């Protein structure tokens, strides 16, 4: 989660888009209080990770008083992986269980829709592979319940069994970066198709999206040139930081081009279809219902720390809510978002060190 400074020109666009989105209203989405129900002594993130929420809110208030966008720089960019507290990503399974990829004592925490903790793991050495929670960035759950966890700074992805006590597969080479069939450079997002094929956004070091089969065999990639660190572009199938992605019922892929301020749409074989512009937004994650058949997505937008409900047909924002802050319904680095089969939305705050659930 590397923060990119927003230029004054884009800041104007952000404010314009924010005003437009605000006119749409919140779509009737309301915060569910006290979700999830963390057991006594449990917490998300690093217990003593600075700066504390009150300090961040004071920084944001000072920026607002100066007429500067609080969301653009209210939270300082971390110097390294161990200084990023909180929740790096969310995933959801076929039973609507919410998987929290947590940079803390329990790297993976699983909750039911009522907010009860039902499983936790990833906090030990598994099959000789040390899992480091401070390196996490995102994850996914396949249709058999296996869990995929991106350890970004180790340049690898590990597949765990449903009980989270066995490593089944590794993609990438531990601590070795690259842009070929067996290496990543700071991978950022992942999705798994019904046939087990795996799509990875290899976005912080490289600029490519990669398709693997269920065994981890490289099939193809989509990128400008070789998809390396210098291979940025704004054309179809090119990227300026591919970040995260989601899949609908037809297994259409909606992939965030974070610094390109757009979604790129592909079929399940990574054939390009179209683009959905999200100008005025800094999209970090996208959530589509596990059923994936209602034609809408939810965007975690870091520009002004909001959630947008977006029509996948025409790209129009139909609802929006949130702002920079640590109060109810506010966000501080909203970096993960998922939607359950009943339409409830779950949004994760990295620096807020919490998850918020919204229903209507």
Report residues per predicted region.
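Bacterial N-terminal signal peptides
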Residues: 7-18
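Surface-exposed loop and turn segments in beta-propeller and other repeat-based domains
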Residues: 33-79, 121-130, 168-185, 217-237, ...
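Beta-rich, blade/repeat-based domains predominating
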Residues: 43-50, 77-95, 126-146, 176-197, ...
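Conserved beta-strand positions in repeat-built beta-propeller and related beta-rich domains
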Residues: 100-103, 149-152, 200-203, 255-258, ...
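Short glycine/acidic-enriched loop and turn motifs that connect beta-strands
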Residues: 105-107, 154-156, 205-207, 260-261, ...
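Short loop/turn segments that connect beta-strands within beta-propeller blades
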Residues: 112-116, 161-164, 213-217, 267-271, ...
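Blade-level signature of beta-propeller repeat domains, shared across WD40, Kelch, NHL, RCC1
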Residues: 332-360
